[in-house]
């Protein structure tokens, strides 16, 4: 079996998972601090997807911790395929939510009376954190997909 850095069961994967959780939590936190986020569908979508990404990554971080502690590589192709597909789905959803939230922030910024600068900055920072979550999620998916052929 080929050792791919960033694939399930490695310390690099654990780092990616923890990074995804922290960024998703930060995005969720900055979005929900704003009192009016529920008025915009894109912001509600971002909150929903980041709320979904946190337990997904927490579960896979526990799998990584288990594999790292036992020093066993993850060698189950079907489960790895399911994890890769799940990461890809979370990645696409995170990109869609980050893009839609960033678009709404740009529209709100053009009309300063509808969004005070401090609130718009929070929303923009939440969208930025969601983009970073997407990047780490895509990385995890690609690393696991890269490992998959060596297990089959």
UniProtKB/Swiss-Prot annotation:
Residues assigned to the Extracellular compartment are 39-42, 100-128
Under the heading InterPro entries, the entry gives:
CASP_dom, CASPL-5
Q: What is its main location?
A: membrane
What is the membrane topology here? Multi-pass membrane protein
Q: Where in the cell is it found?
A: Cell membrane
Please give the tissue specificity annotation from the record for this chain: Expressed in the floral organ abscission zone and flower buds.
**Segments in the Cytoplasmic topological domain:** 1-17, 64-78, 150-152
Q: Which GO terms describe its cellular component?
A: plasma membrane
Glycan-bearing residues: 111
- Residue stretches spanning the membrane: 18-38, 43-63, 79-99, 129-149
Give the protein name, as stated in the record.
CASP-like protein 5C3
Q: Which UniProt keywords apply?
A: Cell membrane, Glycoprotein, Membrane, Transmembrane, Transmembrane helix
Q: Which family does it belong to?
A: Belongs to the Casparian strip membrane proteins (CASP) family.
Subunit relationships: Homodimer and heterodimers.
Q: Which Pfam families does the record associate with it?
A: CASP_dom
């Amino acid at each position: 079996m080929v050792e791919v850095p960033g694939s399930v069961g490695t310390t690099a994967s654990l780092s990616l998972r923890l990074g995804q959780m922290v960024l998703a939590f930060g995005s969720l936190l900055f979005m929900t601090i704003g009192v009016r986020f529920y008025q915009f569908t894109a912001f509600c979508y971002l909150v929903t997807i980041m709320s979904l990404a946190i337990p997904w990554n927490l579960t896979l971080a526990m799998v990584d911790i288990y594999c790292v502690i036992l020093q066993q590589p993850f060698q189950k192709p079907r489960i790895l395929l399911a994890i890769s597909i799940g990461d890809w789905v979370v990645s696409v959803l995170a990109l869609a939510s980050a893009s839609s939230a960033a678009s709404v922030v740009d529209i709100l910024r053009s009309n300063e009376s509808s969004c005070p600068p401090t609130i718009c900055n929070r929303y923009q920072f939440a969208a930025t954190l969601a983009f970073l979550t997407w990047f780490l999620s895509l990385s995890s998916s690609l690393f696991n997909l890269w490992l998959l052929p060596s297990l089959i």
